[in-house]
Every structure is written in C-alpha cells, then in structure tokens.
Amino acid sequence: MKLPRQSIINRFPDLHIHQTIDEIRELLTNGFDDSQKTIFLCGKDKSDKKSLRYKFSTFLSQEKGITLTYPEDLFEDLLEGQGKNSLLSLETQLADSVDLIVLIPESPGSFAELGAFSMDKALAEKMLVMRMGEFKSGKSFINHGPVRLVRTHGGESPRII
C-alpha cells in the first residue's frame, strides 16, 4: 500500500519513517526470542491519515510477528458501561503487558499518555518516544519533564527520537 505523499507532518519524510521502522524492528528482535511481539501504539487518532501514527500503523501492520494494540480499542471494549475503572489504570494494565510502547506525542491524549507513562519506571523502560521535528529541541514541559524521565529510566539506551 502506497502512502499519500501529502502530509501535515513535513518533518518526517517517508525515508525517515522507514529508518525508524527498522529501528523498531531492531529493538524487538535484538536479544529477544522470535515469538510474536506486541506494540502499544499511541498518538493522534489512528484513522487520521495525515498523522505520523497512521503512517507507522500502516507500515508495522505489514510486519510478520508484530501485533499492534491501540488505546482506543481498549476503551471501547472495557469501558462500555463501566464506571469504576479509570482510563489510566486500564491503559497501564495493557501497556504493562506489551513488548514495546511507541508513543508519538501529536495530540492531547498522547501528551497525557507520555506524562503518565513516564512516571512509571517499568513502562518508561519500554517506551520509544518519537517527537515531531519542530518539538525535538527547545524549552517545553514535555522535553524537560516526561522526556527527561524516559531518558532517566531508559538507562544506557534511552529511546527518544
């Protein structure tokens, strides 16, 4: 499937996406067995074809041995009619059971996920945070708060792109 060239995400050319997919593939296979791997993919609405998350889901869904999981699918299934569970506790349970959390902070919900997950060392160690070009540097709460926590928890190999 060929992706549309027109995109609001101008700072992530398709070549860069392919390179990052290769990095994700390496993270999943380096030091692991060859069993099925599950990626929790967070970002802008997965149906928004202009989002970076949509592009990554398109590429990763074609990879053998990878299952993608989305926060909104969890919400639809588990929260229908339930008032006692918080979104954060349910999402944390799911994120805790996956091999890799790929988080693209490109929407209010994904900003909240980044903040929440960065506070949990076990989850932060599983995170690959992909900041869009214009947000990679500069003074911001995201860079000086959650991103620093992920770097701290990531040890020798923090996963911040």
Annotated model-derived regions:
Residues 1-161:
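Conserved catalytic or regulatory cores that recognize and/or transform ribose-phosphate-containing ligands
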